[in-house]
């Protein structure tokens, strides 16, 4: 979970990961 991820769709926020301080959506 990328706690710093704001906005985007629910799937991105829930399944995404943090890379270099940015939210990367899960596949």
UniProtKB/Swiss-Prot annotation:
Signal peptide: none annotated. Disulfide bonds join 2-23, 5-18, 12-25. Keywords: Disulfide bond, Secreted. It comes from the Eukaryota. One of its GO terms (cellular component) is extracellular region. The keyword Secreted applies. It is found in: Secreted. Negative results: does not show any toxicity upon intracerebroventricular injection into mice and abdominal injection into crickets. Has no effect on human voltage-gated sodium (Nav1.5/SCN5A, Nav1.6/SCN8A and Nav1.7/SCN9A) and potassium (Kv1.1/KCNA1 and Kv1.4/KCNA4) currents (in vitro). This is Peptide Cn29. It comes from Centruroides noxius.
